Amino acid sequence: MDLDRDANLAVQGSVAAGSMDRGDGTAPRFSSAERGLSVLLDILDELGMRGTFFIEGRTAETIDCSCLQGHCIGLHGYDHEDLTGESTGIPMGPSAVSEALSKGFDAVSDAVSRPVCFRAPYMACDDAVLGAVSDLGIRHDSSFYSDGPMEPYETTHGITEHPVPKGKDAAGKTIAAYLWPMHEGRRPPADYIRFADTAEGDFILADHTWHMVEARGGILDAGAASENAAKTADVLRGILDLGFEPAVLLRFGGRSGRRPRPARR
């Protein structure tokens, strides 16, 4: 799960991200991230699951993250930086990347605990970013998509990659294991359950906490937010019913334990 600023928005000419304008400009907001975190944690508690939370440094400094004790803590940059320059058009050099990640690492460490894994903002990652991540002592990453087997694999700098699944649905349309389209009303929960049923190996399901209570079109009212939470719970229950066992990132593969292959139906 990505715990970052509300409805993050790449701002042209700025390395740091903003939030979608709700009438007061694009300055970062964090209230939906905090409210959505509470909703998501309630769902996980109800299902007896722990989550992996990739936390942005500034978010960790702004909201109360103490509720995340006991969950797996990862790093998501400091200011939701576009570390490769793909979205903002501003390439960050190696020293700037290292500085941003180090600042985020310290902020998350102070607010919750030392991050043990990493996901790049915008899923924009390259070898230079992995090098900076490795310098922080982090050895697990989840910044890449894969349309093949979902086994963790070794990358450069001694880092193990845990890819996010991506493939085709029954209609031949691209689908990824990010719940973003569901929250925006473009996919039903059943699409993700069917996608998981085709997976070989681990199935990493990704989401944003702010998306529990806000969509790109605006803040959700109480009824819409409740329906949104119910859909999220339906996805998780449906995947568990396939035979998957819940696990945080560092329990996927390797010496830290393996989730058994789900029973096929």
Regions found by a protein language model. Give the residues of each.
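Active-site beta->alpha N-cap acidic-glycine motif
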Residues: 1-70
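Short, solvent-exposed loop/turn segments at secondary-structure junctions
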Residues: 2-6, 58-60, 79-81, 122-125, ...
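The substrate-binding groove and active-site-proximal loops of carbohydrate-active enzymes
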Residues: 21-31, 50-56, 84-97, 116, ...
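Generic structural signal for well-ordered alpha-helices
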Residues: 37-41, 64-65, 98-106, 130, ...
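C-terminal domain-boundary segment and adjacent tail
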Residues: 45, 194-265
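Metal-dependent polysaccharide deacetylase catalytic core of the NodB/CE4 family, i.e.
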Residues: 47-126, 204-212
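Histidine/acidic-residue-rich catalytic or RNA/ligand-binding cores of hydrolases
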Residues: 84-85, 130, 153-154, 214-221
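Active-site-adjacent pocket scaffolds in enzyme catalytic domains
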Residues: 117-201, 207
